[in-house]
Swiss-Prot record:
Residues 145-155 are annotated as: Flexible linker. The gene is ruvA. This is Holliday junction branch migration complex subunit RuvA. It comes from Nitratidesulfovibrio vulgaris (strain DP4). Has three domains with a flexible linker between the domains II and III and assumes an 'L' shape. Domain III is highly mobile and contacts RuvB. Belongs to the RuvA family. InterPro entries: DNA_helicase_Holl-junc_RuvA_I, NA-bd_OB-fold, RuvA, RuvA_2-like, RuvA_C, RuvA_C_sf. Signal peptide: none annotated. Residues 1-65 are annotated as: Domain I.
Length: 202
């Protein structure tokens, strides 16, 4: 399963872009609207955390700027009646913390602002989000690693590297070095820095 793509932006079409890796492989990646708006010019470097959606007739990649956004997409698409396209539309309208606020504030009607979602569907999605979304993460980020003790960022980034196939010992060593040098990184930043370090053979 593809979980991370980094490379050169080759093309943008609709809500998708083509990313060509340093190895010369091109991937079509569907991204939220706010991510599309911040893409660099063609030839610029981009990186996405990927959720791979497999259907009978297609394999599609959905890309996100942060690990939190990717995980929120997975939560959304685990809800019945919410496919990948609807999940992407929701995340084009609301960031993960916005969705958590909707849950905390019990603002079910806000979801009807998303194209294709009526009141009945919004109520269904909202009910599922109440049980599946981690509202305790709002608004502060997870605790950082300090003094070498694994904190929330360390644990989540380590889990992300494990999902990408890295061994715990190697990933833990690199993450500790990364967070020691840059203690203010969030989970996504720590993952990207660790992946770059691992790619250099560190």
């Amino acid at each position: 399963m593809i979980a991370y793509v980094e490379g050169r932006l080759a093309e943008v079409a609709g809500n998708a872009c083509v990313v060509v890796t340093d190895g010369g492989v091109g991937y079509e990646v569907f991204v939220p609207g706010h991510t599309l708006a911040r893409l660099p010019d063609k030839g610029g470097r981009v990186s996405f955390f990927i959720s791979t959606e497999v259907r009978e007739d297609a394999l599609e990649l959905y890309g996100f700027a942060t690990w939190d956004e990717r995980q929120t997409f997975i939560v959304l698409t685990s809800i019945s009646k919410v496919g990948a396209k609807t999940g992407l539309a929701i995340l084009s309208q609301f960031r993960p913390d916005d969705l958590r606020r909707l849950v905390v504030e019990d603002d079910v009607l806000a979801l009807t602002r998303v194209s294709g979602i009526g009141k009945k569907t919004a109520q269904h999605i909202f009910l599922e989000l109440k049980y599946k979304l981690k509202v305790e993460d709002l608004p502060a980020a997870a605790p950082l690693v300090t003094g070498g003790a694994p904190g929330g960022v360390f644990r989540d980034a380590l889990a992300g590297l494990a999902n990408l196939g890295y061994g715990e010992e190697e990933a833990s060593h690199v993450l500790k070095e990364v967070l020691h040098g840059e203690p203010d990184l969030d989970v996504g930043g720590a993952l990207r820095a660790a992946l770059r370090a691992l790619a250099r053979g560190r």
